[in-house]
From Swiss-Prot:
GO terms for molecular function: DNA binding. Negative regulator of class I heat shock genes (grpE-dnaK-dnaJ and groELS operons). Prevents heat-shock induction of these operons. Belongs to the HrcA family. It comes from Listeria welshimeri serovar 6b (strain ATCC 35897 / DSM 20650 / CCUG 15529 / CIP 8149 / NCTC 11857 / SLCC 5334 / V8). Keywords: Repressor, Stress response, Transcription, Transcription regulation. It comes from the Bacteria. The keyword Metal-binding does not apply. This is Heat-inducible transcription repressor HrcA. The lineage of its organism: Bacteria, Bacillati, Bacillota, Bacilli, Bacillales. InterPro entries: GAF-like_dom_sf, HrcA, HrcA_C, WH-like_DNA-bd_sf, WH_DNA-bd_sf, WHTH_transcript_rep_HrcA_IDD. GO terms for biological process: negative regulation of DNA-templated transcription.
Length: 345
């Protein structure tokens, strides 16, 4: 579709805008990139690229910038993923070589590391909570009036609730209650438990635990919270530091979105397998018209459990950013699978 000369000029325009965020004309492009063509030739070829819709003129300058269509063409047909440079690879290798014993901490720290490497906003979607099954209860008395209710799932999620011990309830009552719950509820899905605790369990509690009804709302709240989808952010406001976000209303709306974790989960829950890129208006979200989103998924023991989202400007350095997300997907899968298998033993 494009000649070698047009491709070379197009790549030069993309490279210029990635690093300067400024439109470029033929004279500056020649001076900056040292292209083996005259300014007039470059100007003519830029005219062809504009006719194809790959570059466009801005209102404030006579120079040209890449268009969404141009970036799409670049990512689909011109981009070749390269190996990460030594510093990126060393940082990732060092991170994943540490010993991790808890899944949530690993996923959260992965989000933070990705944002540190990119200076963009990273979002990791946790394993689907409704598939989690209860693996245990713990009740830790703090004093005569309060205790910590700890709920643990088979996916490594830990949910803590500070609860008030009903008057007249003894530590023996609490111990019997925890034993009954662990004996009867372990292995059941949170999706079922958040709807209703089995009647047989309530009957057992009624026989052996005084004032057990006072604890029922605590259990219901705990199951409901644990069954919510988990979203982990890194550099939540990094995207707002980009020059593209100068509209205060858009900044306010984006901050509001980032605070609504369940909305963020719904926005990205159906990301496809493999490394994917959506550019600008392809995101079907007015807040993200100036953004590109790179996504991938991660697995545990061969089963897809979560997603990785990198949110940055359309002028991002696609080669490096896609490489980072790809390596993150693979390495996180390996470490989570190892952690899962270690916990099964």
């Amino acid at each position: 579709m494009l000649t070698e000369r047009q491709l070379l000029i197009f790549r030069a325009i993309i490279d210029h805008f990635t690093w300067t965020i400024q439109p470029v004309g033929s004279k500056n492009l020649l001076k900056e990139k040292g292209l083996p063509y005259s300014s007039a030739t470059i100007r003519n070829e830029m005219g062809v690229l504009e006719e194809y819709g790959f570059i466009e003129k801005t209102h404030s300058s006579s120079g040209r910038v890449p268009s969404e269509k141009g970036y799409r063409f670049y990512v689909d047909y011109l981009l070749q993923l390269k190996k990460l440079d030594k510093s990126d690879r060393q940082m990732i290798r060092s991170f994943f070589s540490e010993n991790y014993y808890e899944m949530e901490g690993l996923i959260q720290n992965s989000a933070l590391m990705l944002s540190d490497l990119t200076n963009y906003t990273s979002i990791l979607l946790g394993p689907e909570a409704t598939k989690n099954h209860l693996s245990g209860f713990r009740f830790v008395p703090i004093n005569n009036f309060q205790a910590m209710l700890i709920l643990i799932t088979d996916q490594g999620h830990v949910d803590n609730h500070l609860v008030t011990i009903p008057e007249g309830t003894t530590l023996s009552d609490i111990e019997r209650m925890v034993n009954i719950l662990n004996e009867r509820l372990v292995g059941l899905s949170l999706d079922d438990l958040k709807v209703q605790i089995p009647m047989e369990v309530k009957e057992l509690l009624g026989k052996h635990v005084r004032n057990y009804e006072s604890f029922m709302h605590v259990f219901s709240d705990s199951f409901a919270q644990a069954s919510q989808q988990k979203v982990y952010f890194g550099g939540k406001t990094n995207i707002l530091n980009q020059p593209e976000f100068h509209d205060i209303n858009k900044v306010r709306e984006m901050l509001h979105l980032m605070e609504e974790e369940q909305d963020v989960y719904e926005l990205f829950r159906d990301i496809p397998d493999g490394l994917q890129v959506k550019i600008g208006r392809e995101n079907n979200n007015s807040l993200m018209e100036d953004c590109s989103i790179i996504t991938a998924t991660y697995n545990i023991a061969g089963e897809r459990v979560g997603g990785i989202v990198l949110l940055g400007p359309t002028r991002m350095e696609y080669n490096r950013m896609m490489g980072l997300v790809d390596v993150m997907s693979r390495d996180l899968t390996d470490v989570l699978t190892k952690l899962y298998r270690d916990n099964q033993n």
